[in-house]
Amino acid sequence: RRQELGKPDFDTFGMAAYIICRDTEEKVQAELQRITTMNPESKAYAGYKDFVGKSQLNVKVSKEDYCVSNRGLRPNLIGTPKQIAKRILAYEEVGLNLLILQFSPQLEEMKIFAEKVMPLVEQLRKEKVEAAK
């Protein structure tokens, strides 16, 4: 559509995503459950119900969407380091070149991502290039 209007393609195409990285799928699911569980008697749950009730969005806002800002769980960058690395590369293959990542607690989770996921992303990229030769 941009080309039809005589405009250049976007240089950057990105998305926001919340990362949950654990060594096992069981630990991933436990953390997901922890951050998306709301006590029905809590103010947070009341806020969610109020938001959903008053929302004029054309999409359903799930509890998971509400618990993590920017609907950060939708990109599904949760899993083991290898699962996340493969998903990142799959997004790259369709043109994504910017990730705005969310972590909590930020520093600790960023370290896990940097130490466990990023090296795998680089390794899998190299393997893909080698396989294409």
How would you label these PLM feature ranges?
Residues 1-4, 106-112, 116:
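Active-site-adjacent beta->alpha loops and helix N-cap segments on the catalytic face
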